[in-house]
Amino acid sequence: MIVIGIAGVVGVLVAMLSMSTGLNKTLTATGDPNRAIILRGGSNGELASFLDRSSSTLIKQDPAIARHPDGLPFASGELIVITEVPRKGQSSGANVSLRGVEPKGFDIRPELNILQGRKFKPGLRELMVGAGAYKQFDGLQVGSKLKFRGSYWDVVGVFETKDAHDSELWADLDTVQSAFGRSGMSSVVVRLNYSKAFDDLKRRLSADPQLTVDVKTEQDYFSSQSSSLSSQIGSLSNIVTCIM
């Protein structure tokens, strides 16, 4: 019995370390040197961050942000909420990130490819599903309906970015805010305008008395998320080792 118990603990430890390696690889592959992410000052991630609309509007006016020929900035206010979807082959559900994005959220991410279906339409309760989530969970096929907060959402597309966003569901920002009772957003993601744009952006936004924000390159942000995750899983692994 002791041998079986030890084998079980070792199996759990190996699984945890394997999961850590896989997640770290995904997170460190996420991000573009020409993009920056702006969070509320002191936040350790998008889930803990909150920016109101006035802050988002002010951020988007910075000249370091590239602009589309239509004159609008390449910037997307984005909101992360946690919801639940069915696991494949199981009756229980699992948490998944639902990201509300603005229309320019697609333009600033040229790596995003639509594998099936189409983009969601602003103002409608429509979802796009990341390729990773599509493989992992049930009920995410194009044409399916999911129920969040008492209302039904239509799955209209499957997308791939080959990074951490593949594990997410995407929808229109305003629609997500309305459905989940949120007045603001988690972050603003922007495409930079020139080679030293990040330094200028960070300097101006950090010095603006109307803002309390942290400004990071997208690569630095996801790298820090990877380091934090590694630390947490490492601590859990040490606890398991001590129990043995």
Kindly give the residue locations of the regions a language model identified:
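Hydrophobic secondary-structure segments that place a key small or acidic residue at a functional site
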Residues: A75-V81, A94-K104, P110-T175, R182-S183
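Extracytoplasmic/periplasmic, Sec-exported soluble proteins
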Residues: L47-L51, D138, N193
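Hydrophobic, regular-secondary-structure patches
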Residues: A7-S97, Q116-R118, G123, S178, ...
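Phosphate- and divalent-cation-binding pockets in alpha/beta enzyme and binding domains
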Residues: G22, Q136, D200
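Short aromatic/hydrophobic contact patches that present stacked aromatics
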Residues: I37, E126-M128, S187-V189
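Hydrophobic alpha-helical transmembrane segments of multi-pass inner-membrane transport and secretion
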Residues: M1-L23, S230-M244
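Mechanotransmission and gating elements of multispan inner-membrane complexes involved in transport
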Residues: R67, P86-G93, Q141-D154, V158-V240
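Glycine-/small-residue-rich active-site loops that bind phosphorylated ligands and cofactors
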Residues: A7-G11, N44, Y134-K135, T161, ...
